[in-house]
Amino acid sequence: MPTVPMTPAPSPESRIRIIALGDELLAGVGDARALGWLGRAVASEQGADSRIDVFASALPGESSAALADRWDAEVQARMSTQGQADGSIDHRVVLALGRADVEAGISLARSRLNLAKILDGLERLRIPAFVVGPPPSRDPGTTAGVRELSGAFEDVCSRRRIPYVDTVGGLSGHEQWESDLSRSPRDHPGQTGYGLMAWLVLHGGFGSWLGTSS
């Protein structure tokens, strides 16, 4: 299990507000249960007090460049300045990065800069980030590009001690993942695939980052 950088734990009295930004997989497209990996991961960490609130914004086919352009406005619109000031709301941002950079031909250097811009901006806002990388495609050529992209994203996060989940590394060659994709007309996972992604996220330190589990 990877070591998750220490993130200040929220006060037991505060609510946890997750602001999640990403592409269509963040929204659980193709999931018959309409939960996606995020819904499953949060449900696993949600206690009886239901103190975790999720405010998600997903854009189909979003590249890192598009995310770098919109993240600030999206986060600011979902923040509670009063809650941040009085400590009643603990804000956290989840970034769900997709494969669009590979498909759009964006260079690795540019992809790195785009993610760095977002993470450095969140640091200035003093909001902890958790990054989930793009999963494999059923197309081997695309998956090869995603592996390189994910490695670049992981390096950016590592330099900033921000947790990163390498889903392409965890799911490439996984029989259940590949079977799930083979049934999809749009190269999206179904219930099984999203469950596998959620498992990787949970075992990538999601609960420790939230402060809801060790």
Give each language-model segment a name.
Residues 57-62, 95-102:
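Cell-envelope and extracellular/periplasmic
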Residues 96-100, 118-148:
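Active-site segments of SGNH/GDSL-like serine hydrolases
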Residues 17, 91-94, 128:
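Structural motif
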Residues 2, 136-214:
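Catalytic His-Asp segment of secreted/periplasmic serine-dependent ester chemistry enzymes
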Residues 1-60, 65, 70-80, 84-85:
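Serine-esterase "nucleophile elbow" of acetyl-processing enzymes
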Residues 108-117, 145-151:
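Charged helix-capping and loop-helix junction motifs
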Residues 77-90, 125-126, 208-210:
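Glycine-rich phosphate-binding loop signature in dinucleotide/nucleotide-binding domains
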Residues 29-33, 105-109, 140-145:
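Short, solvent-exposed loop/turn segments at secondary-structure boundaries
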